[in-house]
Curated annotation (Swiss-Prot):
Listed name of the protein: Large ribosomal subunit protein uL29c
UniProt keyword list: Chloroplast, Plastid, Ribonucleoprotein, Ribosomal protein
Localization of this protein: Plastid, Chloroplast
Domain of life: Eukaryota
GO cellular component: chloroplast; cytosolic large ribosomal subunit
Entry's Gene Ontology BP terms: translation
Matching SUPFAM superfamilies: Ribosomal protein L29 (L29p)
GO molecular function terms listed in the Swiss-Prot or TrEMBL record: structural constituent of ribosome
Gene3D superfamilies reported for this sequence: 1.10.287.310
UniProt source species: Phaeodactylum tricornutum (strain CCAP 1055/1)
The family this protein is said to belong to: Belongs to the universal ribosomal protein uL29 family.
């Protein structure tokens, strides 16, 4: 699995990001389980899953932060008017 660039992930909707986070967490769990039970797996897939999970969570937190800033700006304009 090749990792998509952050710019490609940023075009996802919030719902798609949430679904991708859940899928990636499940994939990471399965890879860790395979490692613990000494089944065959590709070790680089753990690194890729962690990186993808970090990218998705970062994007989601950035969007939430932007929403908070917009709400704060709206509240400030309402207070001053």
């Amino acid at each position: 699995m090749s990792l998509p660039a952050f710019t490609e992930i940023s075009s996802f909707s919030n719902t798609e990001i949430s679904v991708a986070i859940i899928e990636t967490e499940n994939q990471l769990f399965n890879l860790r389980f395979k490692k613990a039970t000494r089944q065959s797996f590709k070790s680089h897939e753990i690194k890729n899953a962690k990186r993808r999970l970090a990218q998705l969570k970062t994007l989601l937190s950035l969007r939430l932060e932007n929403l908070d800033q917009k709400d704060d700006n709206l509240i400030n304009t309402l207070i001053t008017n």
